[in-house]
Amino acid sequence: MTAGKLWGGRFRERTAGLVEEYTESVSYDRALYAQDIAGSKAHARMLARQGVISAGDAGRITEGLEQIRKEIESGEFVWRTEMEDVHMNIESRLTELVGDAGRRLHTGRSRNDQVALDFRLFVSDRIRVWKNLVRGVIAALTAQAHEHKDTLLPGCTHLQAAQPVSLAQHLLAYAWMLRRDYDRLEDCDRRVRICPLGAAALAGTTYPLDPQSVAAELDMYGVFNNSMDAVSDRDFALEAQFCGSLIMAHMSRLCEEIILWANPNFGYIFLPDAYATGSSIMPQKKNPDVAEIMRGKTGRVYGGLMSLLTTLKGLPMTYNRDLQEDKEPFIDTDRTVSASLEIMAGMVEALRFNTRRMENALRAGFLNATELADYLVGKGVPFRDAHHITGNAVALAEDRGKGLEDLTLEEFHSVSDLIGEDVFAVLDYRAAVERRCTHGGTGPASVAAQLAALQQWLSS
């Protein structure tokens, strides 16, 4: 027997040291210790209820597991590479503590369904953390939007000035992105939190197990349907990894705008000192490094998604050791997503906006051109003709170094006799925003409705 290996009965030679180092996972999957202990406690109690082990042994197992939890959390627990992973480390220590009872714990269970359970619980627990952190960013965006309902700035398409919008509308766009992320996480969790215990290695087990009671004890939504699928499925991790990637994509977009708006050529925001750094050579610099790093870390999370997709590609049924490579990318993603969400909430809350600069920027780029086209439509001009006439007016204003609102009535008449004195009220930027009365638009009533909906959701 290979010394120290819980599976070593049929082996006569020791595992090569380099192989142990190469194949171990305890250096990172120890992060799943709490889920492993919770799953083992539930399994032991179920075995006792089903008469597979005695109630006394189940009690000793749960007491031993609780002691191990305390040892781990106090830093006393010794993690051993030769034990390969978190599961074998804990079971080995359990046997040291409670003897034969510890050796009965694995009855009716394989590491295949054990690791599937632990990883599902871990991913689900982290999803619930992400949900709370997403709420924090939405709350920060909503609070800033509430403060800036009346602040206007250029809305852009193609990063070119397009139409005036409220700053609240702009910020709420990100709040709604993250609100969808929250819903995705909630939906994902229903598929993650499914109990695979009882699938054993791949074919089920001969013991009279009760997976439903284990699922209930662990607050899971249900049990597996097919034992082979249960031990080889990593859809749940892939889906959670995608949710994390999309959260980072949305925050990376917001980071990009923070970076742009902090540039003096925009000058829309005053970057908080707590979320900026300086230059080693240029004393005047105040760099948006936090937003840049978050934007960069988005690629790291995407890498985890591609890593898991590639790992799963072409795997035959059922469990394969390739699946050991599912956890490290997700653990890294969790650290990145969790930290990014927490930092983003603080950064958004600390932002100060240069509202005068934003409103002055409205005069560049003919943001009221659509208003002129709509005005002409109101005079009975077909929209395509109105579009053409407005284009001529823009060209005229551009040639004369004016905004549309600065043209004289005589100059307007050179492009259309239908334009009257009332056009000047139409070209006012604030009036343009106030006329956007459709559902979801930048008009005050719509913005107020969006704020109310998000505030109600946040308080629920």
From Swiss-Prot:
PROSITE patterns: FUMARATE_LYASES. It catalyses: 2-(N(omega)-L-arginino)succinate = fumarate + L-arginine. Keywords: Amino-acid biosynthesis, Arginine biosynthesis, Cytoplasm, Lyase. GO terms for biological process: arginine biosynthetic process via ornithine; L-arginine biosynthetic process. CDD domains: Argininosuccinate_lyase. The keyword Transmembrane does not apply. GO terms for molecular function: argininosuccinate lyase activity. Pathway: Amino-acid biosynthesis; L-arginine biosynthesis; L-arginine from L-ornithine and carbamoyl phosphate: step 3/3. Transmembrane segments: none annotated. Its EC number is 4.3.2.1. NCBIfam families: argH. This is Argininosuccinate lyase. It comes from Oleidesulfovibrio alaskensis (strain ATCC BAA-1058 / DSM 17464 / G20).
